[in-house]
């Protein structure tokens, strides 16, 4: 009977421990945040060699947005701030007003939704679309496969859009095309990849929408593989975060999205060339106005309807943030070229890194209890299976 009693006690203790482990300690929003508004840089990026993504030739006006469900209020207990589907964020526009139609800031290690602004509002994502294109290529393709560019893949592209200058009949590996897609934001690489994976771009777009549904994206509908303007092509900041998190599970994606240069070897039709990133958060060689040493990778986007867009990941100390910016300014106060998405991303990251830290409260290396064992001289040490952290302000 004593053995049974001890086993019951042990079972109850372990059950309580696992419940504790599945929870984090209460989190409360910072009541006062001392932040001064950062004035936007009005200096334009040099235009002599900048590989800026090109907007569509035809002006299409302001983006049409679909009214989302009412967003939940800020603050709340810890469970309401947890995960990419969190109904609440710790802060929003009242605490920090940023140049963006929508902005999401998620701390990845703790899965804490730190900042949210219109994250369920449907907007055009421009070339952030290409993260989904890259994800499906990594999921279904072989990086070393040879792919021949078809004329059909190039026929419907806007010649003024961002491009790697692919030629019909030119042969690349899938890996090379993914670098074109992500580094130079090449519109011409997207349909070529789509034809390789699915046989046609429409079939690939169907796969994109199926994958979005699989990832729990409830405000997304893709109409093309590159992100150029289409009334039926839209997503949300929250959905883009889900897509980015899925892509980050691939080491090759992390390698590609963090590269600022790539040497594209000579092909059967063209000489060797160097691909240069459109992401000035990770590359200061063209302009240092937007460089942020904390940012380790990301993807940019821009069309006139979508505005400046960026998704990036940044690290500092024990914090790792995913930031999604949609609909930021593209023109400075003096009318010059301006990258409001980069400025807003850095300001959001400043807020996240400066306002919060995380401390380990339970460690797999430190026992939390010693349980006696009946008819034995030694006790059993109980330790967490994983580290448990909580936020400290």
Residue ranges and their predicted role:
Residues 20-32, 37, 42, 48, ...:
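Active-site-adjacent loops and short helices of periplasmic peptidoglycan-processing enzymes
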Residues 2-5, 49:
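Short, low-complexity interaction segments enriched in Ser/Thr/Pro/Gly
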């Amino acid at each position: 009977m004593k053995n049974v009693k001890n086993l019951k006690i042990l079972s109850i203790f372990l059950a309580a421990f696992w419940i504790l482990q599945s929870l984090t300690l209460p989190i409360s929003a910072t009541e006062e945040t001392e932040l001064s508004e950062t004035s936007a840089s009005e200096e334009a990026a040099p235009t002599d060699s900048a590989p800026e993504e090109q907007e569509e030739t035809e002006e299409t006006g302001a983006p049409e947005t679909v009214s989302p469900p009412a967003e939940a209020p800020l603050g709340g207990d810890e469970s309401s701030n947890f995960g990419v589907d969190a109904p609440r964020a710790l802060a929003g526009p009242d605490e920090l007003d940023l140049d963006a139609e929508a902005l999401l800031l998620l701390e990845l290690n703790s899965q804490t939704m730190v900042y949210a602004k219109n994250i369920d509002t449907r907007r055009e994502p421009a070339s952030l679309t290409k993260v989904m294109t890259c994800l499906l290529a990594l999921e279904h393709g072989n990086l070393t496969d040879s792919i021949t560019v078809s004329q059909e893949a190039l026929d419907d592209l806007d010649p003024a859009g961002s491009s790697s200058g692919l030629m019909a009949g030119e042969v690349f590996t899938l890996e090379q095309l993914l670098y074109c897609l992500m580094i130079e934001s090449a519109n011409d690489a997207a349909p070529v990849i789509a034809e390789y994976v699915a046989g046609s771009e429409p079939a690939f777009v169907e796969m994109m929408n199926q994958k979005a549904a699989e990832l729990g994206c409830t405000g997304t509908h893709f109409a093309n593989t590159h992100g150029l303007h289409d009334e039926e092509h839209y997503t949300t900041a929250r959905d883009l975060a889900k897509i980015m998190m899925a892509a980050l599970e691939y080491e090759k994606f992390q390698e590609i999205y963090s590269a600022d240069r790539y040497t594209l070897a000579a092909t059967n039709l063209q000489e060797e060339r160097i691909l240069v990133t459109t992401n000035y958060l990770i590359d200061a060689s063209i302009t240092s106005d937007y460089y942020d040493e904390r940012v380790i990778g990301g993807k940019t986007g821009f069309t006139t309807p979508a505005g400046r867009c960026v998704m990036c990941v940044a690290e500092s100390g024990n914090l790792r943030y995913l930031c999604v910016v949609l609909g930021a300014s593209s023109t400075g106060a003096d009318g010059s070229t301006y990258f409001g998405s980069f400025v807003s991303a850095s300001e959001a990251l400043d807020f996240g890194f400066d306002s919060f830290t995380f401390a380990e409260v339970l460690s797999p290396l430190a026992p939390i209890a010693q349980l006696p064992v009946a008819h034995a001289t030694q006790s059993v040490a109980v330790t967490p299976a994983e580290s448990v952290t909580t936020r400290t302000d």
